[in-house]
Amino acid sequence: MSVALFVRHGKASAFGSSTDYDQLSPPGVEQSELLGAWLAESGIRADSVFVGPRKRHRQTLDAMAAVLASRGAGLPPATELAELDEHDGIGLVFKLLPELASTDENLQAIVAATVRGESPSPDDVLAAFKRITRRWVKGEIGHAEIEPWSAFRARVARALDRIATLGRGKTALVVTSAGPVAAAVATVLGVDDEEKVLDLSWSAYNASVTELDFTGERWGLRTFNATPHLLDRRLITSV
């Protein structure tokens, strides 16, 4: 039996802010370093490392790796997998926001604030994101320039297939985003209610660990969204 430790990236920049979301915040770096320390103290050694293509994925891995190396538990070179990228729900929101705002007062307020040169509140943007993506995963809306939800689910399944080729008795460290973590769990458990997959992704904490095991052709779930390394409650975040 082998194990895959799926890690959601550390806390990124504020959702909906004018700063680059694809960038770890200082708390995100701290979360990642604490995870590296916990892995070292737990005696967990990765035989293979896979990382998503975003800066926040690589920055999370780098922060973990630095701590592990300082404790004599260096990681092997990482393999970047495009299949571990997050879905582009954020891009979808901005593509469809003007059109959808014509029938949604809450969305109209976000558009109006943007037109005035103001930054909408992160809470308003997050609420809009959730409403729009729920419709997206049900196939009610979409955009030609945005990867369909079904294609996102399929590529995460391909990532699982790639990881499963490692063979028995191996441990893989996988650094990605909340969406792929949730999609991987849903694939393993056979969840086909796509809104529930979204709910799983929204519940994922930054720098959390989800542990999957695999033997032959069968995957199993051991733990989901664990944060044993984050003892300070201020570091329990979901951005």
Label every PLM stretch briefly.
Residues M1-L5:
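Extreme N-terminal starter segment of soluble prokaryotic enzymes
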Residues F152-A154, A159-L166, A172-A178:
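GST-like fold's C-terminal all-alpha helical module
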Residues P53-R54, E83, A172-P180, F224:
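Short, well-ordered beta-to-alpha junction loops that form the rim of enzyme active sites
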Residues V115-R158:
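Alpha-helix-centered segments that form part of catalytic cores
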Residues A12, P180-V181:
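Short active-site segment of divalent metal-dependent hydrolases/proteases
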Residues H87-P120, E145-I146, S150, T165-T171, ...:
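Acidic, low-complexity terminal tails and accessory targeting/binding regions
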Residues A37-L126:
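Phosphate-coordination/substrate-recognition cap region in phosphate-metabolizing enzymes
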Residues G10-A66, P148-R153:
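Loop-to-helix element that buttresses phosphate recognition and phosphoryl-transfer chemistry
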